[in-house]
Amino acid sequence: YSAMEEDDCFYGFGEKAGLLNKNKAFLRERATDAMGYDAEKMDTLYKHIPFYIRLRRATRKAVGVYYNNFYESVFNMGCEKSNYWPRYTYWQADGGDIDLFLLAGGSIRRVVDNYTLLTGRPALLPKRALGYQGSSMYYPELEKDSDDAVLDFIDTIKEEGFPIDGFHL
């Protein structure tokens, strides 16, 4: 449990639908194949990362919180109210250790820099990986001719002169 201010901003948590600021959100961390998901309201998608940045709006100061635990878990980012306690957040996991890292920095940029120092930074990708990589849940859900729809889309992109390096379904 952690105390929070009413207007604190919370960013991160991996791939999540909805608003970028997760203040007053309840988030589940688990890897799920979310076919046909709701882009505004659905929670669990493919990439769950138990890391968030809290930005204190009044001071514009940021801190990162990383739980090195990949069991299924939940984050409550102030969506509960108590008659006995001020506003709070909490994290709860189904197992494992509490391996908690608090990442100082003051600004979001510095917190992200410290997070990547801790978790590692990616190597420079090959040029082909930096181009357009298309993906959509739209095509597999078509009632018929989904393969033709994908090929038509790729042909249209090529006709427009837009480079495409891959398309994933």
PLM features: what roles do these ranges have?
Residues 1-129, 133-140, 146-148, 154-159:
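Catalytic and substrate-binding clefts that recognize carbohydrates or anionic sugar/phosphate headgroups
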